[in-house]
């Protein structure tokens, strides 16, 4: 598919025949990750399809690294992904019957809002809006020292 304003989407379907058994074909694209791949998955907590930040991270980072966006962009992105990873760990603890800490519970609540407000494919925000929403989520669920972002950026953006 070619887009009028530039860019394209190319899909190449691949099927793996495990052991050559044609009766058990497995659709597979894991061995064919290409430039520009964004990994989508259904988030069971919010019931929407999201851009999976863990599997899409290199593609998402290339939109930030060395680019002219807001000076807080790289640190906000790194903190958000780290907190989202902490939530994934907390979810694993919960599913395995371990007690959750207050921090674990806050990361789970953060992850739900983060997925719904930023990662869901029905979200359409520009970079400034995305950063502002993320700062709002940080200040809603965490203390400034928990997000591990430079103090000057926290002072400029926290709770605004």
Language-model-detected regions and their locations in the chain:
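P-loop NTPase catalytic core
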Residues: 1-159
